[in-house]
Amino acid sequence: MLTEFRLLQFFMTHPDFVYGRQHILDMVWGRDRYLDERTVNTYVRRLRNKLEAMSADVEFVSVRGVGYMFL
């Protein structure tokens, strides 16, 4: 849950920009940790589900071959 919060906080403070998975991993989890880039996919999916359940007026947009952006 804390990681989801940090991920959401990162995107909310950097809206409208596309970020690659590796950059997101470095900024949210730290550069000193080795995690698969698909970890980001899992956490973004969880946040998407929670935001949709709340009918939030924001969304994560997947940019194929690049990463994600938050609108």
Label the predicted regions.
Residues 2-42, 46, 50-59, 64:
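Positively charged, aromatic-enriched patches within helix-turn-helix-type DNA-binding elements
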